[in-house]
């Protein structure tokens, strides 16, 4: 799934700006639905994998189009926060119904069919997708292109490092709870609340918007991350683990809105914003694999340390990109 997701969004930088976005969104919805149904109706493992690959293609393209549209809005940080909150709220329905209701009765195929039905319902909103996006919406003039490519590249690498680090932590939060002596029921109850705290973090970003400027939210996110890693260290107790998960989901969803907003802020062409989806997909693949490898060689503390280093690298990279962008000369129309 993530392979198809990452490949399509990486290639989109070459062609997305040249196609009708509404038509591309309709096509992506169709591919997404057809791929999910293919995976649900096939018994051969190879065909199921092919279905999931193309499901990733459809989902990645839809997400890339959404990122591009939001990135060119007048308040991307705010709108990314709203979008992330909507993802969590809508996704929570399937996240609950899949393993609790649909899976036990209809199996994996039933879950895929339910996902296809869900995508079909949401695809109705595609009719409001703009056909194209103009990147020339800067107020007071446009930044010159000098150094633009390097700044965007730095911001994308920063996002990749950042999400790799966070994915590496998130993939093993259950094991951290078990190491602290918590029961599966306790861990499940705590993790079930992450939808609420995640939405709160995303809506916090939507409410704050750009009131604190471009830099301060990143410092706040880094502070929240340090608190999270500190709480997850040393086999946390029930209270400590609960606070850590609250801090993790609040910080992740709050900060993600600003990470995405910052990349689109420095991408004055509007062409490269779609690569944020590739960076997120890459991080989602590499992070858990990296943490699993490190855990086999050492212990969970080293996993947390390496993840923290990657998150800090992302923080350093995105703030450097923002400083470079703010220092670029402006040309008036």
Question: Which residues are covered by each model-predicted region?
Answer:
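Helix-to-loop junctions at the C-terminal end of transmembrane segments
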Residues: 7-21, 201-214, 295-296
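Extracytoplasmic gate region of multi-pass secondary transporters
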Residues: 150-192, 196-200
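C-terminal membrane-cytosol helix-exit motif in multi-pass small-molecule transporters
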Residues: 95-106, 110-138, 317-322
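Intracellular juxtamembrane helix-capping segments at the cytosolic ends
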Residues: 60-74, 253-267
């Amino acid at each position: 799934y993530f392979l198809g997701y990452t490949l399509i969004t990486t290639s989109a930088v070459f062609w997305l700006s040249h196609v009708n976005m509404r038509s591309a969104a309709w096509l992506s919805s169709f591919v997404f639905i057809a791929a999910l149904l293919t995976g649900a109706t096939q018994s051969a493992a190879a065909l199921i994998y092919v279905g999931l690959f193309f499901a990733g293609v459809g989902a990645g393209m839809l997400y890339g189009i959404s990122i591009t549209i939001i990135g060119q809005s007048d308040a991307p940080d705010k709108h990314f926060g709203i979008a992330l909150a909507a993802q969590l709220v809508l996704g929570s329905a399937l996240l609950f119904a899949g393993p609790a209701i649909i899976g036990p009765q209809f199996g994996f195929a039933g879950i895929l069919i339910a996902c296809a039905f869900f995508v079909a319902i949401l695809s109705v909103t595609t009719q409001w997708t703009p056909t194209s996006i103009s990147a020339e919406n800067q107020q007071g003039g446009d930044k010159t292109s000098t150094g633009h490519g390097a700044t965007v590249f730095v911001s994308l690498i920063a996002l990749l490092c950042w999400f790799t680090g966070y994915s590496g932590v998130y993939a093993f939060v259950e094991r951290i709870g078990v190491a602290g002596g918590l029961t599966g029921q306790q861990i499940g109850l705590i993790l079930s609340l992450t939808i609420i705290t995640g939405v709160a973090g995303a809506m916090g970003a939507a409410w704050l918007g750009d009131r604190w400027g471009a830099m301060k939210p990143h410092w706040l996110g880094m502070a929240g991350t340090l608190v999270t890693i500190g709480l997850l260290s040393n086999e946390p107790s029930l209270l400590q683990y609960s606070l850590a998960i609250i801090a993790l989901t609040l910080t992740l969803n709050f900060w993600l809105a600003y990470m995405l907003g910052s990349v689109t802020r420095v991408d004055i062409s509007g062409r490269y914003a779609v690569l944020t989806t590739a960076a997120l997909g890459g991080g989602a693949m590499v992070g858990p694999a990296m943490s699993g490898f490190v855990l086999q060689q050492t212990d969970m503390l080293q996993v947390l340390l390496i993840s923290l280093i990657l998150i800090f690298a992302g923080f350093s990279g995105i703030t450097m990109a923002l400083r470079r962008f703010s220092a670029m000369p402006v040309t008036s129309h």
